[in-house]
């Protein structure tokens, strides 16, 4: 097989540790930026200031009272992201997880899908990560095309009214957002905290 040949197949059992490390690395690449984005919004700054003021009456150290709320808030954001995207998903109705493999066996990306919560919601990407050594080489685009094909096939087999794919993206993951927009996806809301978006959702009718 050619060294640069890129294929997608189901993950093998012996590849779980490698895939898990890839997912964790993908979260680490964005978690600091997401935490910075979240904690520099005005409501978050106000809450941190209030918490620090309260702690000054309890703790003897001014520096500790100032830094402890920030540390706890950053830890909460990071733990939330790692729990959501930094672990292997359970088997879903769409099969998988799948891995992108370059050449004869170099695993360079991972993808997982799940059905939407309601009829007509289509399929959702629950995990999408590319090894940092293989980025900007078409792996993400190849996994996205595979996800679209799986979503279309699943919608047809389930009698869904439409084939649709939804991809959640952390607000700081500009490269992924750019790839999705270039492939015809549109941002349509998301979720966050205190009125500020932390994760945007991109969708496309297939």
Curated annotation (Swiss-Prot):
GO terms for cellular component: membrane. The keyword Protein biosynthesis does not apply. Residues 6-206 form the N-acetyltransferase domain. It is found in: Membrane. Its EC number is 2.3.1.-. It is a single-pass membrane protein. GO terms for molecular function: DNA binding; N-acetyltransferase activity. SUPFAM superfamilies: Acyl-CoA N-acyltransferases (Nat). It comes from the Eukaryota. Its main location: membrane. Coiled coil: none annotated. InterPro entries: Acyl_CoA_acyltransferase, GNAT_dom, NAT_camello-type. Keywords: Activator, Acyltransferase, DNA-binding, Membrane, Transcription, Transcription regulation, Transferase, Transmembrane, Transmembrane helix. Pfam families: Acetyltransf_1 (PF00583). The chain crosses the membrane at residues 57-77. It is an enzyme of class 2 (transferase). Probable acetyltransferase that binds the 5'-GGACTACAG-3' sequence of coproporphyrinogen oxidase promoter. Able to activate transcription of a reporter construct in vitro. Belongs to the camello family. This is Probable N-acetyltransferase 14. It comes from Mus musculus (Mouse).
């Amino acid at each position: 097989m050619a060294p640069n040949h890129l294929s997608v197949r189901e993950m093998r059992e012996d590849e779980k540790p490698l895939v898990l490390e890839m997912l964790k690395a993908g979260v680490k690449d964005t978690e600091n930026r997401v935490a910075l984005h979240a904690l520099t919004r005005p409501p978050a700054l106000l809450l941190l200031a209030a918490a620090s003021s309260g702690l000054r009456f309890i703790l003897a150290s001014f520096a500790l009272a100032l830094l402890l709320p920030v540390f706890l808030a950053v830890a909460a954001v990071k733990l939330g992201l790692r729990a959501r995207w930094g672990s292997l998903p359970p088997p879903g109705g769409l099969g998988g997880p799948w891995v992108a493999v370059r050449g004869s066996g170099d695993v360079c990306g991972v993808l997982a899908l799940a059905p939407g919560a309601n009829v007509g919601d289509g399929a959702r990407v629950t995990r999408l990560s590319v090894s940092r050594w293989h980025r900007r080489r078409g792996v993400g685009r190849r996994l996205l095309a595979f996800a679209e094909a799986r979503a279309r096939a699943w919608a047809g087999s389930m009698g869904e009214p439409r084939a649709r794919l939804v991809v959640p993206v952390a607000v700081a993951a500009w490269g992924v957002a750019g790839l999705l927009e270039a492939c015809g996806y549109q941002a349509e809301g998301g979720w966050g905290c205190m009125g500020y978006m932390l994760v945007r959702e991109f969708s496309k009718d297939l």
